[in-house]
């Protein structure tokens, strides 16, 4: 009896392949602009394990595909609307990376506020000598009012970690969260006007495109701090670089960018920006857990008839 065929377009965490190879036939193909598959092979594919985009046109080439397991909590690269129309279940990897991303958000906030990377670079350059000291950091976390743009699973973990710092916490989402005591603002502009620190942790959707623009940055003000661990899609990078250069915004800490891995030169230049190469979930334990969830979703689908973590748009409800 032939094994179920799973398509893997491009690279994916090696642990996913290790978990699946003894149960399924792995059809690994290079990632290219188009999906070049022999018709016979395409007709045997019943599942996809993917890290990155998977457009609707590719789904149309796979008449028997049932489930697409996405490596990552964000799944904006997968055409879920088209998948739903075709009855294809899409899964992601929520929860297993919440702690890591939340920890990174706090670390990035502290590094940005206290200029810790610059202080370390100053020391490594041999500048710490008798009679010298690194200049006082302009900002402190003490007494800040932090606004969370997004209060999903990760946003809530960030908020929990902020509480011991004794900062005031507020948030903006599409609707108020029941059972949450933080102040709620129905608009992002209202939140930005009220706070001096904004942490963005929202997904890539048409509604979040460049919502953090010049107007929002101006509302945060010259003492304002922006931290983004969500999606670069949400920030107008030209407006941000201009605000950092002019002093209209105090500082920014970014783990994500609009067109990764490209980082605009105007963001590399300001000394009041702390930049990371999208590493919020990038630890061995967390990536292993994400890989396990990709594999477990596929195994559960074919052995029990239900995925573990289907996305909301999927034909199978969580």
Segment roles from a protein language model:
Residues 151-152:
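Glycine-rich Rossmann-fold phosphate-binding loop(s) that bind the pyrophosphate
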């Amino acid at each position: 009896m032939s094994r179920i065929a799973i398509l893997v377009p491009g690279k994916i965490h090696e642990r996913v392949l290790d978990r699946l190879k003894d149960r399924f036939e792995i059809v690994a193909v290079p990632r290219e602009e188009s999906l070049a598959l022999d018709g016979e092979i395409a007709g045997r594919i019943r599942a996809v394990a993917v890290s990155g985009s998977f457009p609707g046109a590719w789904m149309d080439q796979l008449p028997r595909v049932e489930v697409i397991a996405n490596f990552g909590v964000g799944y904006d690269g997968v055409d879920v609307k088209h998948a739903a129309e075709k009855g294809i279940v899409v899964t992601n990897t929520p929860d297993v990376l919440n702690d890591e991303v939340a920890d990174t958000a706090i670390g990035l906030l502290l590094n940005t506020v206290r200029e810790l990377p610059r202080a370390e670079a100053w020391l490594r350059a041999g500048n710490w000598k008798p009679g010298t000291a690194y200049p006082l950091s302009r900002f402190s976390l003490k007494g800040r009012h932090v606004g969370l743009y997004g209060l999903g699973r990760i946003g809530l973990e960030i908020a929990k970690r902020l509480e011991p710092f004794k900062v005031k916490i507020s948030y903006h989402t599409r609707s108020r969260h029941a059972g949450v005591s933080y102040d709620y603002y129905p608009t992002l502009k209202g939140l930005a006007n009220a706070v001096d620190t904004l942490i963005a942790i929202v997904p890539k959707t048409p509604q979040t495109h460049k919502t953090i623009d010049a107007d929002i940055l101006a509302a945060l003000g010259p003492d304002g701090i922006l931290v983004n661990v969500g999606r670069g899609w949400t920030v107008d990078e030209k407006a941000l670089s201009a605000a950092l250069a002019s002093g209209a915004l105090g500082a920014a800490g970014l783990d994500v960018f609009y067109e990764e891995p490209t980082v605009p030169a105007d963001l590399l230049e300001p000394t009041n920006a702390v930049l990371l190469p999208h590493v919020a979930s990038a630890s061995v334990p967390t990536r292993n857990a994400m890989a396990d969830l990709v594999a477990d979703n596929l195994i559960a689908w074919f052995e029990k008839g239900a995925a573990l973590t289907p996305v909301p748009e999927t034909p199978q409800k969580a």
